[in-house]
Amino acid sequence: MTRFVWWLLVALAAPALAFAHGGVDAAKRSVEASMLVTGEIAVNPDGSVYGYSLDHRDKLPPAVVNLIGQTLTGWKFTPVKVNGKPELAKAFMSLRVVAKQIDAKHDAISVESAAFGAETAAANTPSACADRSCLAYIKRSPPSYPHNLVNDFVSGTVYLAVEVNRQGKVSQVAVEQVNLRRLADGTMLDRWRRELGQASMEAARSWAFSVPQTGPEADMDHWIVMVPINYSVRVTGTSEVIGMPGYGQWDAYVPGPVNLIPWLQKRQLATNGNADAIPDNGTPFIADARFVLLTPLGGDGAGKIFPGANPGPG
């Protein structure tokens, strides 16, 4: 096993809990690590990529920077039209770069999900919406952390899909995916995912938003907001926080299944299921429907292989 994947298993196994070895072994085989990389992308009138920038490039492993460059050059979008005419268009970009073990001697990294939203990440904050053209939080109460999961040092991320009506209330909410940073058998993992998902949905139902009153979205009857909720545990008596990797650092976890949501299915199929590409920056994320990727997400940079080595620090 490579040093990189060995480190992932150590990170997920401590503090240790006792589970049936067969179930844990199955979970180990599905372990992956990823990091979220944000930036901006510009698309030519013909749909090719004009250029891009990455936030805090100096914090990213060189292998990740190179992979993204090779991947994006092969992308092709549906031309973005303004008043019926294709034009150069910019969007906020968020990419999920995933590292997986191929065999005992090789690891591979690839871009596995992407999200494109407002032109800049700050466009959904109240201060940037003085003209009330954006959706913004009025109330976002955090969820309650299930006590038994805290005691078992279970951390993870829940990816929610939230439908907001014209009154700024949550009309529908569903869990799209739950990734866990603990090893256990399948039954236990399912239970933990269910508990974190229920806690997240319960909190989301109490949220309130200010809805767009001006601009292109003012006439919409509802908005779909993608929200990641991170659950992390601080180890008593230490500064260690389980489940809070920094920007440019690898986040090890057992990925959960992507749930197909009936009222969201059209968007999920069109975007190849990009739930885990949503950044948790405290602002409502609304995908920009104008940016439709026509080529495979991995482009020409998919699956870069690293023989017996770590694909980069972080």
Where are these regions (language model features)?
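Bacterial N-terminal signal peptides that target proteins for export
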Residues: 1-8
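N-terminal signal peptide c-region/cleavage motif recognized by signal peptidases
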Residues: 13-15
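Charge-biased low-complexity segments
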Residues: 19-314
